[in-house]
Structures are given as structure tokens and as C-alpha cells.
Amino acid sequence: MSGHDSKYFSTTKKGEIPELKEELNSQYKDKRKDAVKKVIAAMTVGKDVSSLFTDVVNCMQTENLELKKLVYLYLINYAKSQPDLAILAVNTFVKDSQDPNPLIRALAVRTMGCIRVDKITEYLCDPLQKCLKDDDPYVRKTAAICVAKLFDINAELVEDRGFLEALKDLISDNNPMVVANAVAALAEIQENSSSPIFEINSTTLTKLLTALNECTEWGQVFILDALSKYKAADPREAENIVERVTPRLQHANCAVVLSAVKMILQQMELITSTDVIRNLCKKMAPPLVTLLSAEPEIQYVALRNINLIVQKRPTILAHEIKVFFCKYNDPIYVKMEKLEIMIKLASDRNIDQVLLEFKEYATEVDVDFVRKAVRAIGRCAIKLERAAERCISVLLELIKIKVNYVVQEAIIVIKDIFRRYPNTYESIIATLCESLDTLDEPEAKASMIWIIGEYAERIDNADELLESFLENFPEEPAQVQLQLLTATVKLFLKKPTEGPQQMIQVVLNNATVETDNPDLRDRAYIYWRLLSTDPEAAKDVVLAEKPVISDDSNQLDPSLLDELLTNISTLSSVYHKPPEAFVTRLKTTVQKTEDEDFAEGSEAGYSSSNPVDSAASPPGNIPQPSGRQPAPAVPAPVPDLLGDLMGLDNAAIVPVDDPITQSGPPLPVVVPASSGQGLQISAQLSRKDGQVFYSMLFENNSQSVLDGFMIQFNKNTFGLAAAGSLQIPPLHPATSARTMLPMVLFQNMSAGPPSSLLQVAVKNNQQPVWYFTDKIILHALFGEDGRMERGTFLETWRSLPDSNEVLKEFPGITITSVESTIELLTAFNMFFIAKRKNGNQDVIYLSAKDPRDVPFLIELTAMVGQPGLKCAVKTPTPEIAPLFFEALELLFKA
């Protein structure tokens, strides 16, 4: 619709639908075209015009391309709600796919691919096969994308009808845009498939590199992304690939530049020549710098990616730090990212320039930016030992400005500097103490208290300074209370005089009697008993030499960094999280959460929680109150350990909890307290005595009593559901309860490919429903009867076709010994069959059996003590193999 068609969006009078129906059936072409435009306009603004489906479909029989496009647009929107009527359009689609006009042929196959109705996919196959071999490249490139859409609707159909092979053939097409679309489609299919579909070999590589020079910019992005996954055979091949890709660094499109950088970084891992690497680093710097002259939004994406790049290859931009200096009109989100990169690029050579910039930023008006700038100075001091003194000088100058939030942030970072360089810069403590009265932020107070406690022997009036903080001890945040407690103990141990002795009595009394905070209370009791039992031992513990903190500017784990670098120019590189942390793969994990699955406000489907007598609880689902709740039984009296030391009263000591309540391994947090209104839920599937359980820990950090707990599990691959009700007693504030909920299998199974996704809903009487996602760990489902005889194992292995064998490598896993590996896997019902040597590698064979008695034949290959584990699984259900690999990796990394 053109710009002149805005009149169709104007509000129409009552009785619009009958009038449109009449116009759609008019004998005049122009009137029908205007009517379809009105229908599309109404549909666009949200009006329901589905009742006109048959009338609009009748308008498909036209030679007018514009009208045909509009009708197709209507069909895409309403075919899902009217699947039976959509079949009426099939004959026209098939006819249009054979039209002499290539635009109409492409339009027909594109529209059929967009209509996500199973009944239509059967009719799509024949036209699609013809279009994949069409003489016109425009039709072929459209058909290539349609294969990916069809795979998303019906993967089995795509494989059975040979569309994947046809798609691979298009990589050899003489038209670069067809090649690019074929690559894009294959890459999309590979993302949603567990088996290898798109593998680049040397022949394919040459074709892709040739097409790279001739296709459009977005085609180049698809090809570069595919090439970044190719592993060169040797350094020479890697150099040749990089040489062909390097010209893309000069491209005007930012996406092409970042994809080229990603591809070059991946190949650089294989290049051994230092000269070649040095030259590549020089070539990558200018295009990355150019990205920073784009719009702020693009700058932000570029900066997030550059942040990753400089962590891996800091030499690329080591001489370009000035381009990251903040401009006065930069948005705050750009300034923050520039600060991060400046810290990473700071060196002894450029630190003076960097400190001048940071000092300038610390005088700006944006409080968050100022805080970040002050903290950046401290991080540079920790990173660069030679520059630490200059950094401290700048911080002291900022303290003299007497701006409250600047002073407080400076004290926080100086505490970290003292940790990094103990007994070096303590001469500035007097200056810091001048600002005591202005401190009102918990972190700044805690930092100042730590400094006073740590250097109490060098501060003459340390007891007076701490006493000034103690006046408001009960009202202080937990962070400050904990630091005050420790600092007072340090002061007493360093200066065991009357003043500190009285202070510690007050603090310990407040921390054990007057507080509801379990962390504070527990720490106070630890100190209390340490001091009363053996003050010398207390000195060894409390005044022990602390580990020196290290530079935190490269905060990402190396394995995570490598994964993020393979995802440069994607959302993953902006979030700095791996894709699986925030994306569920559409084909494998997205499941419906309709009203019948998780009914908001309805208790149907939930397993309820009732406060019942423990004797009546089902076996294995017994609530276990944790140590956060005082145990009812009073233990043997605690000896008066403090009486002879300070004459303190021991009567206030809370009974030590029964250790049985602390049993069980720590569970992963699935609902943190911060997002659960104070309720924290930890959970994981487990197995005990042949029964599958859902182990759960509920912790109430809110101020209310929580009761009436209920749980519901969504449809899932294995049909896991609760076997009984959830037995959780009313949770009072600062208490917790652990339970093991028995589970049953194959009750509520989901359709579609296997997935480890477990969607859970938990509710109680006081809060809204909490939805969370957990993992089905396959080894929790393996049966105790999975052991095979060696002969049976060999016979089963040979009887299964090679296509049922799935391989995966785990480069980050190291086997320390064969025996410990066998012991670990046997504990999770993966039973040892045999082992052998293959050169300097050990090969272990194991067997397991899933709940449906489907065998898993496992072959593990690794070199003891060296990173890298190869796993082959042969099973009648190879589609489950990815879930097995996921569980195996979890076991080895636990």
C-alpha cells in the first residue's frame, strides 16, 4: 500500500463488514482492490475481519500483482485461525508457483511457507521442489528460505522429501544471492537440529569465499557467520581464509565488519606466525574505531563487542585508547561502556592520560557516571602496581572536593587498594577519617569500618571511631553490622584493654540477642566461642594474613569468553551471556503455556501443601526445617566459655540446631529472593532408592508467614509430574524447609522433539504464582537395571545402525583418573562394561537404561590429565542423545 492509501485507515461507519463483503464481490476490479485495501487496513489496526476470509480468497484469481500481495498478506494473518478455509487457496498457490512471472512464482512459494498450517505443508512440497530448481535466481533464493520455514513446521517432511540435499546443492549455485540464502537457511536449520546438517568442507569453503565478493551486504553476513564455524585444517589454510575475508573489514555496514572480525578472530586461534597475527591486529583496529563514529545505539553494540575482543586480544586497540574517551554529548550507556574498555586498555604507558580523564569525569553531574569513574581509578590502581601511588593521589584530590558521593566511593575503592597492597599506603588513613561524619551509604560505612579494624594498632583513637558507629548498631544495615562486629573483634585482639573489652560485650550482646539476622547472629557466636576458648587461636583466625586481591578487569571466565567471541554481533555478545542463558530454541524447547497448563488464579493441576503431621507424610516428601529456624529440642548445656574472659552472660546463646536438618547437597536457585518477593526456591531432580524425586528448598526471607504451598509441572518430554501433594509447613520469616517430592513419569507428555526443559509453577496463599524453568537431568531417570553383560553390549552395539550413533566432544572436561570416572558414573546408574587403551588415550565403555527400558551404549575417550573428552552414544532413540550429553557435562563440571 502506498503513501496515498492512508485514507483506508480512517475510522469507518457502523455496518462496515457487510459493505466490505459486498465490495469484495463486486464485478469491478478497482472496487475489489479498494475493498481488499480496506480489509488490510482494518486488520492492521486490530479489527477482526476473519469473517471475510472466503470473500478475500476469491480475489486471489487476478493478474494484478499488488492485489495478489494484499490477499496473500491477509491469508498469512488469518490462515491459522481458519485452517480449513485456507485449503481453498491451495490451488491458486500451486497455479501461481507455475506462473510465467518469476515475481509471482516467488510470492506464491514465500506465502505458502509463511502460512504455518500443517494441512498446507503437504501441498507446498511439490511447488517448492520445482522452485528450488527454477531457472530464475530470485525464485531459487526465495525457495531456499522457504525450506527453513518448512523445517520449522515439519522437520521430518523436509528430510523425507530431500529438501536438505536440494538446499546443499544451492551452495554451488552460480548466483551469489542464492548461495547466501542457502547458507542462511542451512545455518538456521542447523541451529534447531541435533544432528550435523551443515558442515563446511574445503570444496564448500571455496564456493562460499567466491560468493562472498559478489553478494549483498546481508548475504555477506550470513556467509561470514557460517565461515566463522569452520575449523581450518592447518595454519596455512587459516591464513588463506583470513586473507580472503580481510577486505570485508572496510565495508560500510557495521554487521559485515563485526562478522568479519568474528571470523578472523576464530581463525587466528590456528595461526602460529606472530607476524601474521600482529598484522591482523593492526588491520582490525581501524574498522573497530570507525564503528565508534556511528549513532549511539550502534556505538553501544560495538562497545559491548569490543569489550570482549580486548579481553582476548588487547593488542588490537592498545594504541587507540583515546577513541574511548567520553564526549560531552555521549549518552550515559555509551559512557559507561567506554569506561570499562578504558580500564581494560590502561597500561603503565598511558595511565597518566587515563587518570586525567577519570578525574575529569569525577566532576560531572551524573552521579552514577561519577561513581563509576571513581571506581575505575581504584581498579586501575589494583591492576597496575607502578601506577597505584598516582591513582591514590588522584583519589585524595577528589576527597578534598568534599562532594559526598565522591568521597564515599573513594573510600570504597581505597579499601580495595589496601587489600591489594597491604602495609603500603596506610599514611592516608588520617585523611580518610576526616570524612567519617559524612558517610551515610552502607558500602562506604562498611569500607571505612574495615579500614579502622584492619589498622586499629596504627590508629590512636580507633576505639572512639568505632564507638561512633556503634551508637546506631541496631538500625544499621546488615552489611555494616557484620563489618562492625568483625572490626570490634579485631580491635579487641589488637588492643585488649578495658575500652575495647566493654565495646565487644555490647556488640556481641546486640549481635546475638537484639538481632533477627541469622548471618550476624551465627558470626557473633563463632567469635564468642573463639574468644572464650582460645584467644590465641582467635588471633590466628581473625587476624590471619588475607589473600591479595587481583585485578578484576578481565572478569569473564576464559571458556565463557571464547563462547561469546563465537557469538560476536549477536545479542549474546551484547548481554555477555551465552545464548542458552536467555534464549530457548524454538524447535526444541519452546512449549505452550496455555491456560490449561498453568491456569492463573486456578488451583486445578497444582499439588497442594498442607501442614500435616510428619507421620502422615508420604515417604520421601518430609519437610526438613533448616538451621535458620531454632530447633525445639534444647541440646546439652554449653560450658560457660566466656565467663572467665569477660564475665559475659551465656544464657542468651540460641541452641545449636540438630545437624540432621542441614543434610542434603546445595540445590541450584531457581527463584531468587530478589524476584520472589523474599521467597527463595532452590530445586533439582534427584534419584534415591529407585525413585525419582524433585528435591526442593524453600527459604522465607520476607516479613510474612507463607503457607498453602502448591506445585504444578507443565507438559514435558518425559511426562514428569508430582506423585503426591507438596508437604511444606507454614514458613515463618527467616525460616526454611527442604522436601523431596516423589515424581511419576509419562503422565503429561509434550509433543515435539525431546527437550530437557522442565517448566514449573509454585504458588502459596500470600504471593502470586512463581513460574520458573528447570532442567530434566537425564541421569536422574536412569534405572538401576541398566547394567549389561559384555556379550550383550557388543551384540546390541552391532545390531544398531551407524546412524544411531551420536558423537560429541567436550574440550573443557579433564579426566583425572579412569577409576574415579567409573565410580562417578556408576553412582548415577551408568555401569562399567570394559576399558581399553588406544595409543595414549583411555577408552571406557558403559551402559545405562532410561525409564522406557531404552538402552544407552556409551563410549568415552580421553587422555588422563589432559583437557578433552570425546563421547559416543549408540541408542535406539538417538534424538535423546543431546539430553544425555547435557547431563554428562553437568556431572563432570559439578
Swiss-Prot record:
Subcellular location, principal: Golgi
GO BP terms in the entry: intracellular protein transport; vesicle-mediated transport
Residue ranges of the region described as Disordered: 597-640
Annotated compartments: Golgi apparatus; Golgi apparatus, trans-Golgi network; Cytoplasmic vesicle, Clathrin-coated vesicle membrane
GO annotation, cellular component aspect: clathrin adaptor complex; clathrin-coated vesicle membrane; Golgi apparatus
Gene Ontology MF: a single term: clathrin binding
Membrane topology annotation: Peripheral membrane protein
Keywords of this entry: Cytoplasmic vesicle, Golgi apparatus, Membrane, Protein transport, Transport
Source domain of life: Eukaryota
Pfam families membership: Adaptin_N, Alpha_adaptinC2, B2-adapt-app_C
Function: Subunit of clathrin-associated adaptor protein complex that plays a role in protein sorting in the late-Golgi/trans-Golgi network (TGN) and/or endosomes. The AP complexes mediate both the recruitment of clathrin to membranes and the recognition of sorting signals within the cytosolic tails of transmembrane cargo molecules.
Quaternary organization: Adaptor protein complexes are heterotetramers composed of two large adaptins (beta-type subunit and alpha-type or delta-type or epsilon-type or gamma-type subunit), a medium adaptin (mu-type subunit) and a small adaptin (sigma-type subunit).
Family statement: Belongs to the adaptor complexes large subunit family.
Name of the protein in question: Beta-adaptin-like protein B
Organism: Arabidopsis thaliana (Mouse-ear cress)
